[in-house]
Structures are given as C-alpha cells and as structure tokens.
Regions:
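N-terminal strand-loop-strand
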Residues: 213-239
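Catalytic cores of DNA base-excision repair glycosylases
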Residues: 4-194, 200-211
Length: 239
C-alpha cells in the first residue's frame, strides 16, 4: 500500500475532533490556520471558538473595528496576524464581493497568507491539488526517506516541497494533508515518537537505521562571539 493510502487509512480511523473540521467553509479554515501559527493546539481551540463566537463570518470580521479584533486577540501575541486577518477580511468583503478565493495563486496574494496556509485552504476547502509543508510534514518526510538536508534552508525546502507534491494521492487532498498533520502530532512526534504504533515503520529509513532522534536535521548556526577591546590613551604633553 502506498504511503498516501496508509496516511488516509490512518486518518479515517484516528483523525482529531477539531471544531473547524466540522465545516469546509474557507473562512473557518483560514481563521484556524492563522490562529494555530505559533500557538499550541489546546490554546488554539480555545481562541478559535472565542473568535468565531465574536466574528462568525467574513462580514462580521470585515465590518468590525480593528481595535475589537486586537482586543479579542490578546493572549495570542504576534498581533500582526490579527491585523492581517482584519485587512484581508475587508479586502475579500469589499473588493471580491465576499467570495473567498479558491486557487492557491489567488490565496497566496492575500496579506498574511503564505505557502502553507494557501495550500491548506485550497486543498481542504476546494480539493485543489496542493501539498502542505509544516513542521510535521518536514519531520515525517525526513524520517521516512532518511533525508538529511537541513529543513531550515531555502534550498532544502524545495527538496521537501517536491517530495510532498510527489506523495499526493489522486484525490482527497484536504484529508491527506490533515492526515499528515495529525500523524505528525500523534505518532511521528518530535520527541518520543510512537514508532511501535506506526503503520509506516517498516518503510521508514530512520526507524530501520536508528536515526529517528537525529532527523530532521537543522542547519548549525554559527555562534556570535562578543569581542571586548581595551584602549589605553597616553597623553604626553599634548603630543
């Protein structure tokens, strides 16, 4: 069975019950993805429910005052996310006739939406063939295929992105992408992964070669040394 089929099978049996998965509405998926940036899942669920209660749809967010959005965002930090949400909501509401863009190319041109979020929205909501690439996906791909390219270098990112695209199934792109994210959070965790429960362990290069704890690889950062200089000034009759 192919890797993508195994992930879909696992997802069908083990997917997490998350509030934004009860809908395919791009507004809800967008809000959840932005909130979950730099935010733990438990905290993200709380803030998502609170945000949707206050701003249940695009119109309510677009027609609100920015100060109200920022007030609701308190505790999440990175306030540029909230400002970008408000800006993009107004743009879609006033300039796109409230119609959320469906394609990756349109989505990525919106303020605050990058490669990952554009791929997630287009695949989950509109079944567009796009691969997500986040920490979970980097980790899964690196371990399964034994890829030792540093995940935090731009050139390496292209390698992982190509592999992620090649692994896409023939359908159910959104479910597959969400399956990867869940699999990385529950099974192929950064620390203490559940390799004994992993249905891909027999195919996993890292597992077969005891490399699980060393993959994925991050580039070594040069330590910045602080240099101190002492100066001695001798004044000899103003000469």
């Amino acid at each position: 069975m192919k890797l993508n089929s195994l992930i879909l099978k696992w997802y069908d049996q083990n997917k997490r019950d998350l509030p934004w998965r009860k809908t395919k509405n791009p507004y809800n998926i967008w809000i959840s993805e932005i909130i979950l940036q730099q935010t733990r899942m438990e905290q993200g669920i709380y803030y998502y429910n609170r945000f949707i209660s206050k701003f249940p749809d695009l119109e309510s967010l677009a027609t609100s005052d920015e100060k109200d959005v920022l007030l609701l965002w308190q505790g999440l930090g990175y306030y540029s996310r909230a400002r970008n949400l408000h800006h993009t909501a107004k743009h879609i509401y006033y300039h796109l006739d409230s119609k959320f863009p469906e394609s990756y190319d349109e989505l990525i041109n919106l303020k605050g939406i990058g490669d990952y979020t554009a791929s997630a929205i287009s695949s989950i909501c509109f079944e567009k063939k796009h691969a997500v690439l986040d920490g979970n996906v980097f980790r899964i791909i690196s371990r399964i295929f034994g890829i030792k390219e540093p995940i935090d270098l731009n050139n390496s990112r292209k390698v992982f992105k190509k592999k992620a695209i090649d692994l896409l199934p023939k359908s159910r792109y959104g479910d597959y992408n969400q399956g990867l994210m869940d699999f990385g959070s529950i099974i192929c965790k950064p620390k203490n992964p559940l390799c004994s429960d992993c249905l891909i362990s027999k195919k996993c290069v890292a597992n077969k070669n005891q490399l699980v704890d060393s993959l994925p690889v991050k580039a070594k950062k040069n330590k910045i040394k602080t240099l101190y200089f002492e100066y001695l000034i001798v004044n000899n009759n103003n000469q």
